[in-house]
């Protein structure tokens, strides 16, 4: 790839927030035309749906104030969160609340700076009561939804040549000046690798990429200010395993 002509999607998506920390409607209108098949509109609708969950397994026992007695069922989380939202707020933040805010900020920064060091799962609860949750693996650009798998079969598995790897990925030469993290994959040696998101994408992948592959301020905005995305830490190993069991079933 010639990096001089590479579009830095992370930088463009980071402009979703203006200097005042509010959604930039001009940027929203521009990004609508940047992605095909109304993917951007559908991704933003997902972010606003209260159905997106980022579960993090927190090994640090000193962070108990942030994670004590957290349920792993999406319905449980929504009920608890709605109760907190409708409860009257105290006039002054307590020390525990301030501590939780600091811990949450540190976690968000870690998800950006060292995502590989944090064990986490990305899940979207579907509207239908009988529909299984959608699981997203952002680091490998995979989604369990039907739309992703249909596109993958149509665009990746129809021809034997070239190889699946060469069709699905692109590499930037070592030393390239691009800082884009959108659709980035684990590096291969000194080269930076990206999944060909222009070939395969779905609203779930784009939505989580907006949250986790742009800027920490965007994740903070949607998990705290807008409060439409759930960032949940789990310390109890049994609860973490229960989460995986619920997803598999």
From Swiss-Prot:
It is found in: Nucleus. GO terms for biological process: DNA recombination; DNA repair. Keywords: DNA damage, DNA recombination, DNA repair, Nucleus. Residues 68-95 are annotated as: Disordered. GO terms for cellular component: nucleus. It comes from the Eukaryota. Its main location: nucleus. Plays a role in a RAD51/RAD54-dependent homologous recombination repair (HRR) pathway to repair MMS-induced lesions during S-phase. Required for error-free repair of spontaneous and induced DNA lesions to protect the genome from mutation. Belongs to the SHU2 family. This is Suppressor of hydroxyurea sensitivity protein 2. It comes from Lachancea thermotolerans (strain ATCC 56472 / CBS 6340 / NRRL Y-8284). The gene is SHU2.
